[in-house]
Amino acid sequence: MSPERSQEESPEGDTERTERKPMVKDAFKDISIYFTKEEWAEMGDWEKTRYRNVKMNYNALITVGLRATRPAFMCHRRQAIKLQVDDTEDSDEEWTPRQQVKPPWMAFRGEQSKHQKGMPKASFNNESSLRELSGTPNLLNTSDSEQAQKPVSPPGEASTSGQHSRLKLELRRKETEGKMYSLRERKGHAYKEISEPQDDDYLYCEMCQNFFIDSCAAHGPPTFVKDSAVDKGHPNRSALSLPPGLRIGPSGIPQAGLGVWNEASDLPLGLHFGPYEGRITEDEEAANSGYSWLITKGRNCYEYVDGKDKSSANWMRYVNCARDDEEQNLVAFQYHRQIFYRTCRVIRPGCELLVWSGDEYGQELGIRSSIEPAESLGQAVNCWSGMGMSMARNWASSGAASGRKSSWQGENQSQRSIHVPHAVWPFQVKNFSVNMWNAITPLRTSQDHLQENFSNQRIPAQGIRIRSGNILIHAAVMTKPKVKRSKKGPNS
C-alpha cells in the first residue's frame, strides 16, 4: 500500500472515530442517570457497557412478562431522586401507604455508595466485586413494570442536592437499622406438657385446714426448718444435724431411749421439719429396722428410707411416737417422695417432739367413714384419700388397734415395723369428694401375724406406714394382739 493512499484514507478514519464517540455517549445516556457525575467520571467504558447490558436484560424480562429483580444500581439512583421529590413540603401528590415505606435495601445501598466513592479506580478492575455489587439482593417487589418507566430527574439536578439527600438518607438509614430485626435473634420458647399435680405435691395448712400447692392463699408459703449442715459419712451425723433450738436427750416416755426436745422458743403451728434422711432401699427387710418409713412412688411401687445408720440419717430418727392424742404435736406426711414432720400444735420450750400419723390428723381433715371396728384378728382398714375436702376417717380412734390408745401398763409396747395381715377392702366410704384419688389398695404384708415388742425400748414413729399427701395410710385393727419380745436394746 502506498503512503499517498494511506494519507488519503486517514482523514476518513478520523471522521469515523469522531462519529463513534457521540454514539457511545448516547448509548450510555440511559445508564448515566443512575450515577452522580463523580461516579460516572471514574467509571470505565467496560463498566458502563456491563451496566447497560444488565439494564437491557432486565427490561427484556419485564417486557415478556417475567418477574425480575431490579438491578441494584438502578434502585440506588431511583431512591435518591425520590428523596429529592419528598423534600417539597407543599406537594399536592396524593398520599399512599407505599410512599411511606422505608425499603430495607436503603441502608445497604447507602453503605455501598460510600464504599464505591472511597475505592480507588483500580479496585473496579476486580470483576468479582462488580458481580457482588450487581447481584445484591433487595426486597423490593418490582413486578410492576410501570415503576421502571417513571420519569426521573436529570443527573445535574440530583448532584446539586446530593449532599443534602445523603444526610437525609443517613438519618433514615439509622431509623431503618433500629426497626429491622433478625429472625435468628428471636427468643426461644420451650413448651412442655402440663401435668396434673400428684398426691404428694400438696401441703396442708393447719390454720385454715386446707390443702395447697407451694403457698397457702391465706397464710403464704410454709416454713421449712433446715438441718445443720453435716457431711454424710460422719459417724455422729444424726446428732450433729440437729437444728438450733432443739436438743437430743432422754425421752419423757418411760424407758423409751432418747428423744428430741424444744429448748429455745415456741415452735409455731404449721412449722415443717425435714426431710427424713437415711438409706434409700426397696428391700423389705428395712421395715424391721425400726427407723424406716415406707414411701409410695406409684401404684404398687414402694421404697424405704431407713435411718438406722447414724452416719447417713439425720436428727429426725430420734423423734419418738406419741402415746395418745394429747401428746402428739407433730404429723408425718410424704411430700415429693420424702418424709416430713409438721407441727400440728404450738410446741412450748421444754416439751418433747412426738410424732404420729393416725386418726388425730384424720379428724382435723374431717375424715368420715361408715366402717365399724373389726371383731376378729386379721382384719384391718387401709384408709386414705386424695385432695378432697371430705375424706374417710379412720375408725381406729376407738383405740382397738393402732397402739396409740392401747394400755401401756409399764411394758412400753413399741410400734416398730407394724405388719398388718389381710386387709379388708374395698370398704364403703361416705362423703368422698369428686377430686379424691381413686387409690384405695390392699395393704402389703410380709407376715401373717402382728408383731410388737414390749421390751425396754423407745417408741419410734418410723414403724408407721404412711402415704403421700399428708394422709394417714395404714391403721391396723386388732384385738388381743400377740406380741414377741425383741432382742434389741434401748435407743442410743
Curated annotation (Swiss-Prot):
InterPro entries, per database record: aKRAB, KRAB, KRAB_dom_sf, PRDM7_9_PR-SET, SET_dom, SET_dom_sf, SSXRD_motif
Domain of life according to the entry: Eukaryota
Pfam families for this protein: KRAB, PRDM2_PR, SSXRD
BP term (GO), one: regulation of DNA-templated transcription
Class in the EC hierarchy, top level: transferase
Region (Disordered): 1-22, 111-179
SET domain segment(s): 244-358
Alphabetized PROSITE patterns for the sequence: KRAB_RELATED, SET
Entry's Gene Ontology cellular component terms: chromosome; nucleus
SMART domains xref list: KRAB (SM00349)
Annotated SUPFAM superfamilies: KRAB domain (Kruppel-associated box) (SSF109640)
Keywords tagged on the record: Chromatin regulator, Chromosome, Methyltransferase, Nucleus, S-adenosyl-L-methionine, Transferase
Residue span, KRAB-related domain: 23-86
Cited function: Histone methyltransferase that selectively methylates 'Lys-4' of dimethylated histone H3 (H3K4me2) to produce trimethylated 'Lys-4' histone H3 (H3K4me3). May play a role in epigenetic regulation of gene expression by defining an active chromatin state.
Protein's recorded name: Histone-lysine N-methyltransferase PRDM7
Organism of origin: Homo sapiens (Human)
